[in-house]
Every structure is written in structure tokens, then in C-alpha cells.
Design a protein with these regions (language model features):
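A short, mixed-charge helix-start or loop-turn motif at secondary-structure junctions
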Residues: 3, 86-90, 136-140
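Conserved short-loop catalytic and cofactor-binding motifs
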Residues: 5, 31, 84, 95, ...
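Hydrophobic packing residues in well-ordered alpha-helices of helical domains and bundles
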Residues: 7-10, 93-100, 144-147
Length: 169
């Protein structure tokens, strides 16, 4: 995928999420039950943790270093998500929202630094992709997986809850 298409996909999902968050408002972001017992705030903290790890991983690769996140790169999905939840459960919704969008801004800026060739040539990026993803794949797929595709996984739960709660959404 070309850089421009990757950025467009990321910005499109970001806009959808921003619309949902505006409809929810800070006062309702702590209400549990959006997805299991998780609140909107919890889901955002979860997304931000993965985006943050992606940002650090990309920054390290630009500096010629391999980065493996010792929490988010462990194979047990439930364990790593539990750690993310415990780490963030006492943070305010305002703090999480602010951090989330700041992290997305950083991610977009980092994506701009990569060429289309770097994003699509699995050979040239294998040195830092394989240690984190355990397989050779195009860099854009790694970025998509932990950013806009991850938002796409969680947006339906938020939208469903909003539809149930707000007749004007």
C-alpha cells in the first residue's frame, strides 16, 4: 500500500472515532459495558497502548535499532490486554483521549518519514519487522494491523453502544 493510502485509511478511522467520542462526551467515557466490562476510556487506552508501541518501534527502526515491546509483543493476548487495562484504569478520560490523539499525530508524522518502497518491500524492513512480528511482511501491514485495523475492530462496539444510548447518533 502506498503511503498516501495508508495515511488516508488511518485518518478515516480516526475521524470515525472522533465522531463517536464527541457524541459520548467525557462524562460518559467511564461507563462500563461497551465491550464486555470495558468502557470507552478503557478501549481508547487499549488502542493507545498499541499505537504507542508502534510509534516507539518505528522510531527505533529509524534509528537503526530493533525494538520488541515486552508487554505487547508477548503471545498471550489476554495477559497483555489485562496489563494494559491495569496500567490505565485509574487515568482520567481526558488524559487518555489527549494521549491517544497525540500518539496518532506522532504515528502519522512517522509514517511520512517512510518511502513507499520501505512500506511495501518486505525484504528491506525484515531486520526489524521479523523480531516483532515473527514473520516477514510488508511494513504497511504491520502499521495497519496495530492502528486503523485495530480501530476497526473496536469501533463497532462503541457505535453499537452509542446507537443504544443516543437516538440522535
Amino acid at each position: 500500500m502506498e503511503k498516501s493510502k495508508l495515511l488516508t485509511a488511518l485518518k478515516t478511522e480516526r475521524a470515525k472515532l472522533e465522531k463517536c467520542l464527541a457524541a459520548i462526551g467525557f462524562s460518559r467515557m467511564n461507563i462500563a459495558g461497551i465491550s464486555g466490562f470495558y468502557s470507552t476510556k478503557d478501549i481508547l487506552a487499549h488502542l493507545e497502548a498499541y499505537d504507542r508501541a508502534l510509534v516507539v518501534w518505528l522510531k527505533e527502526s529509524r534509528a537503526g535499532r530493533v525494538y520488541v515491546d515486552h508487554i505487547l509483543d508477548q503471545p498471550d493476548l489476554d495477559a497483555r490486554n489485562a496489563i494494559v487495562y491495569e496500567t490505565n484504569k485509574d487515568r482520567s478520560a481526558a488524559d487518555i483521549v489527549s494521549t491517544f490523539f497525540h500518539t496518532l499525530d506522532e504515528l502519522e508524522a512517522l509514517i511520512e518519514l517512510f518511502t513507499d518502497e520501505e512500506l511495501t518491500d518486505a525484504e528491506s524492513t525484515a531486520w526489524f519487522v521479523v523480531p516483532r512480528w515473527q514473520r516477514r511482511q510488508e511494513l504497511w501491514k504491520c502499521i495497519a494491523n496495530d492502528s486503523y485495523e485495530h480501530m476497526q475492530q473496536h469501533l463497532p462496539d462503541i457505535e453499537r453502544w452509542l446507537t443504544e444510548q443516543c437516538s440522535n447518533y
